[in-house]
Regions:
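Cysteine protease-like catalytic core of ubiquitin/ubiquitin-like
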Residues: 40-124
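Conserved active-site-adjacent core of cysteine acyl-enzyme catalytic domains
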Residues: 1-50, 91
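Phosphate-handling active-site elements
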Residues: 126-129
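Intrinsically disordered, low-complexity N-terminal regions enriched in serine/proline/glycine
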Residues: 34, 38, 75-76, 132
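Cysteine-nucleophile protease catalytic domains, especially the papain-like/related folds used
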Residues: 1-21, 105-122, 133-139
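Short Fe-S-cluster ligation motifs
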Residues: 141-143
Length: 143
């Protein structure tokens, strides 16, 4: 069962995920990056070529952390193991590492659930290391 944007917001709040954005990828153009905040994006643009509003296709997510020592670490997560679209890298201002592991079947519509699980793991899970890359490896090892 797929999730709507409002359901993602609601669940993220209940899960204590520091979510700051849920929307179509082209809506990032009007935003400014916030460090240590989670972004869930729909891989379609808000409007199709005919000017009709899209209903959405597939959720992915990313986060860029800034640590007290000034070091930054970002990561893009797609449950299909695909790289980030150019619009995300332009928004972040640099090339983002991404998870290459495919954990979702093409016949499955649970991408929003996978995004929430990933973001909860890296932000809230009590046994996390608070190192974005190590925690991502630990999350992916569950699949």
């Amino acid at each position: 069962m797929s999730l709507t944007d409002s359901e993602l917001w609601d669940l993220a709040e209940r899960m204590d995920i520091p979510l700051t954005f849920v929307g179509f990828k082209d809506e990032l153009n009007n935003k400014k990056l916030k460090y240590n905040k989670s972004y869930i994006i729909n891989m379609e643009n808000e409007f199709d070529e005919d000017g009709q509003r899209n209903t959405g296709s597939h959720y992915t997510c990313f986060q860029v952390n800034k640590y007290p020592n000034g070091k930054k670490a970002g990561l893009y997560f797609d449950s299909f193991g695909m790289p980030p679209p150019q619009i995300v890298e332009d928004f972040v201002g640099e090339k983002l590492p991404y998870c290459e592991k495919d954990i979702q079947s093409l016949m499955n519509s649970a991408c929003g659930w996978y995004c929430l699980a990933f973001l909860h793991f890296i932000n809230v899970y009590p046994q996390r290391t608070k190192n974005l890359y190590w925690d991502t490896e630990a999350f992916l090892s569950l699949f």
